[in-house]
Amino acid sequence: LIGCVSITFEMDDFYKTIDWISPTKKNIYVHRLAVHPNNQGQGHAKTIMNFIEKKGIENFCESIRLDTFSMNNKNNALYTKLGYQKLGQIYFRDQSEMPFNCYEKPLK
């Protein structure tokens, strides 16, 4: 196993505080993108995200939305490099006192 990701088409309640770019109609929500440590730095996360984007376009989705831990510099840099816009922050008090950055990339 090189990597994994979880995606859904349903928006979790904690995302409702974010002022999203695209309408909340048909969007992809990315959760838990991970690449095995032995395979990091080889472009696998980018490949996974490009695959999700392609599937989103094929399925007429408005955008891809996601969050990542604010202190995860690699993920934050990856999403910015791939054209995602940081739109705000949310908190998961049961996970961390630090915020999670929310990103969106319109597909149309």
Segment roles from a protein language model:
Residues 6-32, 36, 40, 94:
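Conserved acyl-donor/pantetheine-binding loop and adjacent beta-alpha core of acyl/acetyltransferases
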Residues 49, 56-68:
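Conserved GNAT acetyl-CoA-binding A-motif
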Residues 32-35, 41-54, 77-81:
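Conserved acetyl-CoA-binding loop-helix of GNAT-fold acetyltransferases
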